[in-house]
């Protein structure tokens, strides 16, 4: 996979970027990993219009196709943004009493390109394969 990077000349606050992209494309699939701009929070990353979404749900059905850890092992290379819930622990500790939940145990989406905002250097990088 050949990755291309474009560094924008002008700084734009990630909140404004996210707001603009939401107005233009809608918020379905929008992912914004925000940071505080301190030493350990240098980057905010934004993805819009995912190419692919993978979810794992139903902690009462512990089959292999629903296992979030199997789904993570099988993803292709790319720019993925998402989360793994605390309840995914049911696949590691199935005998513990887990509460039923409608929330996904895994939600990840593939984006191409992504927008990386360096909050310390005030630099915006668009990174992708096309």
Language model features with spans:
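Signature of the chorismate-utilizing enzyme
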Residues: 1-130
């Amino acid at each position: 996979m050949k990755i291309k990077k474009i560094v924008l000349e002008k700084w734009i606050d990630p909140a404004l970027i996210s707001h603009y992209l939401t107005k233009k494309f809608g918020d379905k699939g929008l992912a914004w990993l925000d940071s505080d701009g301190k030493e350990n929070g240098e980057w905010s990353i934004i993805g819009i219009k995912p190419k692919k979404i993978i979810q794992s749900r139903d902690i009462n059905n512990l089959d292999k196709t629903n296992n979030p850890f199997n789904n993570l092992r099988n993803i292709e290379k790319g720019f993925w943004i998402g989360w793994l819930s605390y309840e995914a622990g049911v696949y590691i500790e199935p005998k513990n009493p887990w509460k039923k939940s409608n929330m996904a145990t895994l939600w990840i989406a593939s984006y191409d390109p992504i927008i990386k905002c360096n909050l310390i250097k005030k630099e915006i990088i668009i990174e992708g394969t096309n």
